[in-house]
A protein has these predicted regions:
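C-terminal and inter-domain tail/linker signature
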Residues: 1-354
Length: 354
């Protein structure tokens, strides 16, 4: 089926192939990476927004920490709204890590560097005419040529800051708006799920000599986040490892990376970390790129990153990619919506004030 016949299509058709079977997909797609890259380009750079009707199912949930959409119609409207605020938006694909298959559904972790200019009003405020570049990771489940479920995280803290807004003022204003019922229900179900399923049990170190890259990453995350063994950073990352994270920060070296984990764990008391999906592909350096979608729950129990503690329960949806070279993590991308954490905290402060 040629969906683009008689329609404008500038999407690149030649991409690095991973040779994945594509039963149920349009013949034009050579593999799942080609599918993700081409449909993303067509919708955003090609401005063929109506293709969301073709590539999203009618009941597809898209989970973000600012709200949940259901189905192709809402995805289409959200895309149009974004382009009204940022008409020149581009999405540069940094990597696509994938797992699954064409029978049960593919999972894709799409790391994106997005650039855009704020030429129209947005949910953060009036147009500022400022340019911004920040990171996004979208985890999609794709089956029979359609995205059937998606978890989307973007660095909204960096977005607000680069547009010239006071991030805390934006968070206060968002906190004053009644929370979407879908989001409220999902937040509570996720808090319950993670609290019941996660333990502080330690995992054996699966480092340099292991061929199980996914097991290595899952064990490391369990030990750092849940067992509080932050020192495992020093045996799992290379000396000059890079961590790209919230607020458009790039941290370098084991000390800075360990401090990143310490600040979050120290601020979010009773923290529990759930790795919800993991997959990997070979990289060009003879190692593996590993993607993880994860969830953190806990309480705002210490001042740390976010000021006077409120004790409010916190939910953090995050996605990461790890580049493993010679058995060590050489580079990491960990993205979560830090603005949404502030919104949860300010919502609690408003409730206390009432």
């Amino acid at each position: 089926m040629d969906r683009m016949q008689h329609h404008f299509d500038s999407a690149p058709s030649k991409v690095k192939s991973h040779k994945s079977p594509m039963a149920g997909f349009d013949d034009e797609f050579t593999d799942i990476v080609d599918y993700i890259l081409r449909i993303t380009y067509r919708i955003w750079e090609g401005k063929q927004i109506g293709l969301c009707y073709d590539y999203y199912s009618d009941d597809c949930p898209v989970y973000t920490m600012s709200g949940i959409t259901i189905g192709a119609e809402e995805v289409t409207q959200n895309t149009l709204s974004t382009l009204a605020s940022f008409p020149d938006r581009t999405l540069q694909a940094e990597n696509v890590v994938w797992g699954g298959n064409d029978i049960d559904g593919y999972h894709t972790s799409h790391l994106i560097k997005t650039s855009m200019t704020n030429l129209g009003g947005s949910d953060m405020g009036p147009a500022t005419n400022m340019e911004t570049t920040f990171l996004v990771i979208a985890h999609c489940i794709v089956k029979d040529n359609k995205i059937i479920e998606e978890w989307l995280v973007r660095d909204n803290y960096a977005l607000a800051e680069e547009l010239g807004f006071d991030v805390h003022q934006v968070a206060r204003e968002k906190a004053a708006i009644p929370i979407q019922q879908r989001l409220k229900d999902w937040n509570q179900s996720e808090l319950n799920r993670v609290q019941k399923s996660v333990t502080h049990e330690r995992q054996p170190f699966l480092g340099c000599s292991s061929n199980d890259s996914e097991g290595f990453i899952k064990a490391l995350l369990q030990n750092i986040w849940n067992a509080r063994l932050l020192g495992d950073v020093f045996q799992s990352y290379s000396d000059d490892a890079l961590l790209h994270c919230s607020r458009n920060q790039t941290l370098k070296g084991r000390e800075e990376i360990a401090a990143f984990y310490a600040q979050i764990i120290g601020t979010v008391t009773q923290l529990k970390f759930s790795h919800d999906y993991c997959c990997s592909i070979p990289n060009d350096n003879g190692g593996k790129d590993v993607a993880v979608r994860w969830t953190i729950t806990g309480n705002h129990g210490c001042a740390g990153l976010y000021g006077e503690p409120t004790g409010t329960p916190l939910l953090i949806l995050g996605e990461s990619q790890f580049r493993i070279i010679d058995g060590l993590i050489a580079e990491e991308w960990t993205i979560f919506d830090e603005l949404s954490i502030l919104v949860q905290i300010y919502r609690a402060r408003l409730s206390i004030a009432e």
